[in-house]
Amino acid sequence: MENNDKENNNNNIEQPVKKNRSKKFFWIIFLSAILASAIYVVYNLYLRPDNFLRQIYLVPKDAIYIIETGDPVKNWHKFSESKPWQYLKEQRKMEEINQKAHKLDSVLQANKTLLDLLGRRNLIIAACMTRKSDYDFLFIVDIQKTSKLESLKSQLENLFKANNFRVTKRNFKGEQIQELYDPLDRSTLYLAIIENHLICSYTGLLVEKSIMEKDDPIIGRDLYFLDVEQKVPDGGLCKIYINYRNLDGYLTLFTGVPDPDIQNIYRPLAYTGLRFKVSDNMLSLKGYTSLNDFTENSYLPALLRSGSHPVTVQKVLSNRTAFYVDMGFDDPVKFINNVEDVLQKDKEAYDAFKKNWDLIEKKLKIDIRENFLSWMSGEVAFAQYTLGLLDRQNEFVAVIKMKNKKDAVKNLNIIEESIRKHTPVKFKTIEYEGYEIHFLEMKGFFRLLFGKMFDKLNKPYYTIIEDYAVFSNSTATLLSMIEDYRLGQTLEKDKDFNQFMKEFNNRSTVFAYTNMRKFFPLIRNFVSASSWQNLQEDQNFVLCFPQTGFQLTGEKEMFDTRWFGEFDVLPAAEESDDEETEAETVDFVDREDVLQDLELFYLEKFQGNVYTEFYDDGSVKSKSEMSKGVKDGKYQAFYPNGKLLIDGKFKNNQRTGIWKYFTENGKTFRKEKWKNGQLKK
């Protein structure tokens, strides 16, 4: 019995020991598995060698532009809450973009996991053409070490399935592409993980192009791109890169047909890289632009090699300036020599240049370098004004800074005298308030030296204001500019302009300035009626940027590039009735106009004492013969379409004789007899 009890006691003791050993064994196995998993994760994330790929290597070679940001979520929120975006997104022109932006914002807000995945990850968005009439975006996110997790793809798949996407998979060039179909809008998002990057697009072709690009990248190894990328300043919301090689098709989407003039501007450019910033009152882009090897028949490479010059023409430009372009270089003769060097790469262009150069010198018996370029300081500007006091033509001026005023006047007189001798031009120099106005018939001269923009100056008049020679096709334009300068109404004395100019370099190679609220009404003269109607419907989109400026400053092999847009919304205008009654159209004949001295001078010297009034669109409203500043002689008034409305006479500013009134069909609907300003019955 005792032996049996001892055996039972021993058995009871052995059972707990076995259970304890089993538990220990289980925990050893479990902890070992956890440790092994941890070691595996640590090894994958931190110890296994990184085979990271540069993000830019996945951007297709046909990318039009590239947007890069280091903190996409935070920067998107900052931009979407800014005053410029809050205003612009409500404009009709931004309707489609705003819908896409709203969808992006909704996705980010609704998907915490996606937000955590992106976080402070570097994001590239590349815009690429998908067909001749459309383009789309490719998104590339650098997920860094997260890409080493084997479960990442399945986690993403589960995430999208949880959001009611239908997920399918296919292989392309050894890489797996996940296709995420959204049954709500029937769109498909294509997604792949390539090395350390997550790439996706709503166009599968772009994901495929990205996969093919990684083995033979083009943009990421392009020296012109790398030069720009290295110099773009840090900070801001994002960096923007423009690939000019692929710009033709993209711009045609908006213009309908290729524009050779626009193409000639960007043809010599390779890439522009810019840092983008936004505040409540300013949008800014700052960076660099590189030129390519194909620089034939372009002034930009010549300008790059020719240095820069301080921007100073605002001293004499009227505060009516709507738009102006300023070119600057160290030395004008050196600039022209550089132009010739560039043009020699294109024999046809160079031969045409030399032919026109020789023709002008032979016809006028002058030496262009000696008689024109020698006295220039190195700054040339072309400007367009709003309509002035004297006429309703488009007012253009060219302004040239003089190095030596005395030498400039001497050589301009030589050119003027040569023109008188060798052409049938008859123009007597006139003087207004101490400023002489001269005439030079030099067709094609300014375009030859400074490019197509100056082609508008065929037969210019000129005057001297301070240290600047000012040229224009219109004497009225010059007289108005002289008067503005005399009255101190110049850009230099415009506080808003001066504040805006602080954003730019003091020296410049090319500088373009636009006062959009002055420039927009002038566009009407250059577009069709239907185009003008469309522009008017979208005018708030551009008028909210009252001042914009673009600047290129040559620095060795690249241009320092800057663009700034001032943001300021106009207050809502009160509605008014623009309809004009027949009586109102007729009544302006009785207005007592008091002409200013400038108008009287212009009438006497240039208009044969005929005073002309204009409608807002520039068409003639009335013509009055004048004597000593009052209506005296024939008077005619016209409908806006140019048809005759009134035919009569004035004597000493009073109606006299028979007055006839006509319908737009040319029929007389009323006759009146006047004497000494009194209507006879």
Model-derived segments and their meaning:
Residues M1-K23:
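N-terminal Lys/Arg-rich, disordered targeting/topogenic segments
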Residues S22-E179, L226-L269, S284, Y288-E395, ...:
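Structural boundary/hinge residues at secondary-structure and domain interfaces
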Residues Q86-R121, L159-M282, S306-V311, Y350-I366, ...:
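An internal, short helix-loop-strand segment that often contains or flanks glycine-aspartate motifs
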Residues I143-K148, Y202-L206, M402-K406, S474-T477:
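Helix N-cap motif at beta-to-alpha junctions
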Residues I211-K214, Y288-S290, L300-L303, N338-E340, ...:
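Composition- and surface-driven signal marking solvent-exposed, interaction-prone regions
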Residues F396-I400:
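Ordered core of a single globular domain
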Residues C544-E575:
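C-terminal regions of mature proteins
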Residues F588-K681:
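Glycine/tyrosine- and acidic-biased, solvent-exposed loop/turn segments at the edges of beta-strands
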